[in-house]
């Protein structure tokens, strides 16, 4: 657990869902960071709306959010979380609410 190692050296952590591996692992990291009074930022890499929407699903429990990686690609075959008036807006559907909008063979 890197959080335990750095808890006295830093004021906060940046969780990237694609690097920690799962929503479940991210939630464990959030719990541990809160235990040590660390600030929590939820970040991302350049990725499709699948990863961004998954990360956005836990955004309400962190201090800061930077989830714009899907806005940096022009061939995202999915529709998920959107930015509305500067705030994340999750889809109103079951699960993550993702919608396949195009089958892009270049992503396979």
What are these regions (language model features)?
Residues 77-108:
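C-terminal extensions of enzymes
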Residues 68-73:
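Beta-strand->loop->alpha-helix junctions that form or flank phosphate-binding loops
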Residues 1-54, 59, 74-86:
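Catalytic core of soluble alpha/beta enzymes
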Residues 64-66:
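Short helix/strand-capping turn motifs
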């Amino acid at each position: 657990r890197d959080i335990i190692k750095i808890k006295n050296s830093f004021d906060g952590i940046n969780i990237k869902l694609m690097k920690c591996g799962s929503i479940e692992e991210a939630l464990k990291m959030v719990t541990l960071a809160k235990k040590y009074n660390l600030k929590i930022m939820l970040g991302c890499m350049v990725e499709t709306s699948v990863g961004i929407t998954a990360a956005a699903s836990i955004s309400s429990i962190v201090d800061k959010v930077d989830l714009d990686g899907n806005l940096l690609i022009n061939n995202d075959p999915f529709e998920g979380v959107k930015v509305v008036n500067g705030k994340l807006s999750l889809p109103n559907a079951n699960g993550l609410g993702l919608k396949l909008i195009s089958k892009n063979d270049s992503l396979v």
